[in-house]
Design a protein with these regions (language model features):
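Short, flexible, surface-exposed loop segments at domain boundaries
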Residues: 2-6, 17, 22-208
Length: 208
């Protein structure tokens, strides 16, 4: 069970979370910078989370007063339709295509979040494409044409690629053993304050 003060913390609307998510990667000032940490919750102590990162490091994160929490849940590859707005972490291929490492399908309320193509930190040399699915082909796996303002990418999605979507969440999801992606402000002394947290629902490890 989450600590009572944590459970009472106000969570912003789902759309407000999407607006915050769109700012990932922007600098937060000279004294602070935006950080993203993939981790497992070890303990919840009031407004603090004790985490073990995927690289094995220990980290304590404090929660901002307006921390936004969202759940990540699995969906099927077949749920990606023409016109879907998606994000996709991928690896560049020699032929210029992108091979998907994961795909996250945005709810309509989050359409436009982070639109574009850029480097990503899931793996060395990985990329992130957020855009609208145009052409969609293939019966074993899928090949997607994803368009965004100023460009497009052809993304090959193998049949075993994890596909997820977002649901509104609450701090009640922040429990020991939950897998999370924490985004927030980190100061030069290593202190981190979480402003938004994505939580894998029912033990899911967020693939992004």
């Amino acid at each position: 069970m989450p600590h009572p003060p944590l459970a009472r913390r106000h969570v912003g609307r789902f759309i407000a979370w999407a607006v915050l998510l769109a700012t990932i990667g922007a600098a937060a000032g000279k004294a602070q910078q935006v950080a993203r940490v993939r981790a497992t919750i070890e303990a919840v102590n009031g407004n603090n989370l004790s985490l073990t990162t995927r690289t094995g490091d220990k980290l304590t994160v404090s929660l901002a007063p307006n921390v936004a929490v969202v759940a990540i849940v699995p969906v099927r590859l077949e749920d990606i339709k023409q016109g879907s707005f998606i994000g996709c972490a991928a690896m560049p291929e020699p032929d210029g295509t992108q091979r998907a490492l994961e795909v996250h399908v945005f709810p309509e309320s989050m359409r436009g979040t982070g639109e574009g193509y850029r480097p990503f930190d899931l793996k060395p040399q990985s990329t992130m494409t957020n855009g609208t699915v145009g052409a969609l082909t293939g019966t074993v796996g899928r090949t997607l044409t994803v368009t965004y303002q100023g460009g497009k990418q052809t993304i090959v999605v193998p049949p075993d690629t994890p596909v997820v979507t977002y649901e509104p969440g609450s701090p009640a999801l922040l429990v020991p053993n939950a897998h999370v992606i924490v985004m927030g402000r980190r100061t030069p002394d290593g202190t981190m304050t979480a402003t938004r947290i994505s939580v894998g629902k029912d033990g899911l490890v967020p693939p992004m």
